[in-house]
């Protein structure tokens, strides 16, 4: 690896620099959007109530005023070993093509971690699409998580339960369900998901589906959010991404310790088209999340998107899937 040739400084990626970065990264992370809609999707995420305070894109700029690397930085509230803290989430790490092999990816990661330490972060995290080796050299450790297929019992038809579309007023109930599942249990790491963070995760997926609507398999992608009520509030819910390839269960919750209402929601949704074969349903299913009696988890494998953490302060990194509670919805 060649040494860094020029001094570099960390700046917010804005204006012409941001446009160049979007041009360079469009082919990798556009998710089937047009170039204009890729820019709109990124900008809209940062304008959400949660994103405007917790999400920024940065660039490394050299002495010539030229950007050489970029990354998104998220400040995510989390709990590690019973202590509330902040995770510096790192996403879309990218080095300008002609500058690769000079260590700029590691430099921007290290500078963002140093910056986040001053903002209260005790751990840094990322999802790797390029394997583990590069990030291991930078001090990251792989955190195991599971990916599963979900089979839903359809033998007895749909239960007599009202399922409706989720709304903004349901978000506090969703946050409460998550807190109940992740506090006071033998669990080492989980996000602290408040209504604003849940709304951000939903908005990100809805924006992607809306901006990408059109011909082609990705243009048929939809985000569906359903709840079952008890009284006047949500008692169980699911968030799904529906596409030509099947369903992805992005997140779910149930006030019922056994999860029976969650299972019933999925039965109701499948009963909308009773004559069609059940779609393939995939999920990251946290091991401490109860499996509803109507569901069966099969084909368990390590999650294909590799989750890695690096300590910033004196903390221990979880090393078992049993220790982590994390939904696909919070991928960054």
Segments (PLM) and residue ranges:
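A short, well-structured alpha-helix characteristic of acyl/acetyltransferase catalytic modules
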Residues: 15-28, 168-184, 323-324
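Amide-forming acyltransferase catalytic core, primarily the GNAT-like/NAT-type
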Residues: 141-251
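Conserved GNAT acetyl-CoA-binding A-motif
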Residues: 109, 114-128, 274-286
């Amino acid at each position: 690896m060649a040494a860094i040739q020029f001094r570099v400084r960390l700046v917010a990626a804005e204006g012409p620099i941001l446009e160049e970065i979007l041009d360079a990264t469009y082919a990798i992370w556009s998710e089937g959007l047009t170039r204009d809609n890729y820019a709109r999707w990124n900008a809209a995420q940062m304008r959400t109530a949660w994103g405007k305070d917790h999400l920024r894109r940065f660039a490394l700029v050299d002495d010539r005023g030229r950007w050489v690397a970029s990354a998104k930085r998220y400040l995510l509230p989390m709990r590690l070993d019973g202590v509330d803290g902040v995770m510096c989430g790192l996403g879309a790490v990218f080095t300008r093509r002609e500058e690769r092999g000079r260590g700029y990816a590691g430099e921007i990661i290290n500078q963002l971690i140093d910056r986040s330490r001053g903002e209260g972060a005790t751990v840094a995290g990322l999802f790797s699409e390029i394997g583990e080796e590069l990030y291991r050299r930078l001090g990251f450790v792989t955190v195991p998580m599971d990916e599963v297929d979900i089979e839903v019992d359809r033998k007895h038809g749909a239960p007599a339960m009202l399922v409706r579309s989720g709304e903004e007023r349901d978000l506090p109930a969703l946050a409460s369900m998550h807190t109940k599942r992740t506090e006071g249990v033998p669990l080492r790491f989980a996000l602290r998901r408040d209504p604003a963070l849940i709304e951000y995760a939903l908005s990100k997926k809805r924006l992607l589906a809306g901006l990408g609507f059109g011909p082609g398999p990705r243009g048929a992608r939809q985000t569906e959010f359903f709840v079952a009520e008890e009284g006047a509030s949500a008692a169980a819910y699911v968030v799904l991404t529906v596409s030509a390839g099947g369903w992805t269960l992005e997140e779910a919750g149930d006030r019922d310790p056994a999860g029976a209402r969650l299972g019933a929601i999925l039965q109701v949704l499948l009963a909308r088209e009773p004559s069609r074969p059940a779609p393939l349903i995939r999920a990251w299913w946290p091991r401490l999340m109860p499996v509803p009696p109507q569901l069966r988890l099969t084909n368990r494998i390590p999650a294909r998107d590799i989750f890695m953490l690096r300590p910033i302060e004196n903390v221990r990194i979880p090393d078992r899937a049993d220790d982590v509670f994390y939904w696909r919805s919070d991928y960054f």
